[in-house]
Amino acid sequence: MQVTVETLEGLERRLNITVPAANIEDAVTAELRNIAKNRRFDGFRKGKVPMKMVAKMYGKAVRQDVMGEVMQRHFIEAIVKEKINPAGAPTFAPVENNEGADLVFNATFEVYPEVELKGLENITVEKPAVEVKEADVEEMIETLRKQQATWTEVEAAADAGSRATIDFVGSIDGEEFEGGKAENFPLEMGAGRMIPGFEDGIVGKTAGMEFEIEVNFPEDYHAENLKGKAAKFSIKLNKVEARELPELNEEFVSKFGAAEGVEGLKAEVRKNMERELKQAVKNRIKEQAIDGLVNENNIDVPSALIDQEIGVLRQQAAQRFGGNTEAADQLPRELFEEQAKRRVVVGLLLGEVIKTEELKADDEKVKAIIEEMATAYEDPTEVIAYYEQNEQMMNNMRNVALEEQAIDAIIAKAQVSDKEVSFNELMNQQPA
């Protein structure tokens, strides 16, 4: 076998491979003999059919099958010989494919980029300095009360804390637009569900009133045809309701299964908030470390890997929205391309960190991750046992631990400082 390697554009490579004719003919002959030996032919005893007849009947198809197998096998031998690491499946193209002559073909594919990590010392990470304060717990308790609140119809004017039930019809330049009409729509005032100015036009109005308001859709509104447009809404206020919060007593506490009364509920709420806070701090640090890693290391990305990741994201999107996963390929590629490329880049860079630092999943870290996750469940010991008895789940956790160790390795070389933030600031912070 003769092999030459061509470097094409970017990460694309082409192998030019020559396979001796004897290899092809020997493989074709062997397969034809196998057919002659094992298949029945009318007028002949099994295994006694003339080879010329078998070759005439099956020779073309057998040669095609042999060529495909030979190209695949010799491609693998070639990449091992040349120490090449393909990032996706090759495209084969025969160049010379005449019976009795050497087979000459090429295989075109992409390779993984050569990654040399740099700039880790330039990465800046602001570690959130935050704790759950008593006021945070009280605010969370108040949120729980609001979730259990009842609404009572009142004759008062609508204000920021009330719920208004309205009919409305929206129009732009006198024309109604899709999605701009509703009847008996319950609107919790102050929740910020509507576009800016909409709720303001309802404040101070009482049930039975009919009126119009004029607002502008934001420039970043999700519907392209409404971005930045001036709109008029005709509104009828059907009902105004006031929120009635439940008493913070034993009856209220019992709804959450907390022991030891109100103080027990507060303790349970604090415990949950501290667990969520710990994860949020970890996520914020990880996000900054990865952003810095990506910004400092610009690498080429194999399109084959991006295509694979787009396929994964399409399937996840279809499952998340209860759609037909078989139709996932119909979802527009543009929806996922940027995220897919980012995932591939991050995966390649973290993989290089793991390789460079010679990291292996730490068993104690794996155990700690599982135990911490199990605290969110009613019976942590049962969850831990489930993971320990499931090898696939354990492998997933080893990968999680390995990624965390890679992040730790980045942080160890980065510029890290503390930044004081409140619980709400951190929890409401949107990922970059």
UniProtKB/Swiss-Prot annotation:
Any one annotated GO CC term: cytoplasm
GO biological process terms held by the UniProt record: 'de novo' cotranslational protein folding; cell division; chaperone-mediated protein folding; protein transport; protein unfolding
Domain of life: Bacteria
EC nos: 5.2.1.8
InterPro entries per the UniProt record, alphabetical: PPIase_dom_sf, PPIase_FKBP_dom, Trig_fac, Trigger_fac_C, Trigger_fac_C_sf, Trigger_fac_ribosome-bd_bac, Trigger_fac_ribosome-bd_sf, Trigger_fact/SurA_dom_sf
Stored NCBIfam families: tig
Domain comment as written in the entry: Consists of 3 domains; the N-terminus binds the ribosome, the middle domain has PPIase activity, while the C-terminus has intrinsic chaperone activity on its own.
Name of this protein: Trigger factor
Organism whose genome encodes this protein: Vibrio atlanticus (strain LGP32) (Vibrio splendidus (strain Mel32))
Taxonomic path: Bacteria, Pseudomonadati, Pseudomonadota, Gammaproteobacteria, Vibrionales
Gene: tig
